[in-house]
Amino acid sequence: MNTNKQFKVYTTSAVDFAQDPTALSSNINAPQFDKAIVVHVFFSQNKNLEDLQEFQLLVKSANVDILSIITTSRSTPQAKYFVGQGKAEEIAQAVEQLNADIVLVNHSLTPAQARNLESICQCRVVDRTGLILDIFAQRARSHEGKLQVELAQLRHLATRLVRRKTGLDQQKGAVGLRGPGETQLETDRRLIKVRITQLQNRLEKVAKQRNQNRQTRRKADIPTISLVGYTNAGKSTLFNVLTQANVYVADQLFATLDPTLKRLPIQDVGNCVLADTVGFIRELPHDLVSAFKSTLQETTEASLLLHVIDVADSRKLENMLTVNEVLSEIKANQVTTLLVYNKIDQVENIQPHIEFDEENQPIAVYLSAQLNQGLDLLVEAIRQKLSHEILHLEINLAAQYGKIRHCFYQLNCVRQEKINEQGEFLLDIQIDKIEWLKLSKQFPLLKRFYETTEISDK
């Protein structure tokens, strides 16, 4: 093996970074890698090829050509290379023989493992997390999306900086103050920290604006419906046919990154806001979930979630579990959810229909967004769900509970108010069930009003 192969390291100096604060993060994606060696490790006797196939789709989504796929089986990751020494040498040989630009590993590597593989392969090594971050960087179109991706990239990069010899290491002090000056590593860490703080401040402003928009919709009594689901389940296609929008649709992972909001009128409910959001995936980088907090807030504070599922996917149950895990992480698992089984045209013996629970409430809709089949059933299920989730209550509060009254007015849910002879507030309110449950936890005395209403309605 030729050990003299030139190894190009892509770095950004402190000087470049000072001149352009985005240089360090944007330079992560500067080289255009076209040819890759894909590495996958099976950690069980049953070789599940679907994980590898999904990773190949991720690589395709990143616009990278796969030259070769190298697989191996292990019981546990090896500490130094993640794969064994022999397999690492095999990967290095493949890189040289096929003239690959990059090695893509379908697992999360420690910084040390990535550096060791880079050293033996003499090319850049990117793990699953890095690849997903790169795809997000390519797809981000809005200003907010670009800020969020940059923040996630910098957080990921901060753990992977290594010491390297530069001129800054040679700085010396005067008499009595001798010693090395600030190293390049220290400089990069400091500048990354500064840039992360800048991005967080900017995103806080964006988050405030989003929150104001949500408050405005809430005061106008406009429900928000958020599309969630595993990536490539057909959320954007469904969004387009429901709202006559023109959101980018493609048969690839993470085709949609920036959230889109459109008006959706629902009979007996009125105008709603439908939100198309980024898809989820197994092992979604935590840095991304954290960076996209303001975007995902649309999901957290929605009136209804439409969990879109690719019914033709053999791993749909695992995908649903992954989505539910992310929803729990962002604290959206308590939001009322309607399951939407999409792509029924790709399976046999399934017709468009609504599935109901024991209380005759819709829990799932089967449809094909691509063929416009079952969309009327979905709209009807949404109507029933939202009608059921909006509470109409009559509340009487003693004068000392003015704080509760103030909360109702803040939510703009008071339709009418009177004061009786005892000085009690008689409130006629219309409130989202989720908001009511939140208030009931804060003020337990409210629970009796909802229970009384449920009994009287039966």
UniProtKB/Swiss-Prot annotation:
Pfam family, one: MMR_HSR1
Name of the molecule in the record: GTPase HflX
HAMAP family: GTPase_HflX
Coarse class of the protein's main subcellular location: cytoplasm
Molecular-function GO term, any one: metal ion binding
Protein's UniProt keywords contain Nucleotide-binding: yes
Cofactor: Mg(2+)
Record text on subunit structure and interactions: Monomer. Associates with the 50S ribosomal subunit.
Gene designation: hflX
Top-rank lineage group of the source organism: Bacteria
Gene3D superfamilies noted in UniProt: 6.10.250.2860, GTPase HflX, N-terminal domain, P-loop containing nucleotide triphosphate hydrolases
